[in-house]
Amino acid sequence: MKILFVLISILYAVYRFSSEEDVDSAYLANELEPVEDINSEQYAALEPKEEQERSCAGMGQDCKDDCDCCLNIATCNCWFGRYFCSCTFGDYQTCLRKKGKCKRNRPQSCPRSNLNRKKG
């Protein structure tokens, strides 16, 4: 009984292996048509779109002046005069300066730290 079971298993494995080779070789020889994806239109909407240019620069991004930086307290810090400029953290005075100077990305309010207030 065990021998019969092993023999049938071997014959089935040989049959499956040979039929897969026929399908693979027919597909490689272009005898079979590839299966079309009926949901391809559905996934077309999920493709990433090109990123549009932002009106302001985030922290660490390139800038030309303080008005290019997004955050209220962000300042445009330049190395060697006007070269290699990027947005970095500023302070309360930076925010006040941006409020008076900038037409776009103007801060609505300037955050003030609670560290220097006297209690008591």
Swiss-Prot record:
GO terms for molecular function: toxin activity. Residues 1-19 form the signal peptide. Residues 20-54 form a propeptide. It comes from the Eukaryota. Keywords: Disulfide bond, Knottin, Secreted, Signal, Toxin. It is found in: Secreted. The keyword Signal applies. Disulfide bonds join 56-70, 63-76, 69-87, 78-85. One of its GO terms (cellular component) is extracellular region. Contains 6 disulfide bonds. Expressed by the venom gland. Residues 56-95 form the Agouti domain. The presence of a 'disulfide through disulfide kOR' structurally defines this protein as a knottin. Belongs to the neurotoxin 05 (agouti) family. This is U13-lycotoxin-Ls1f.
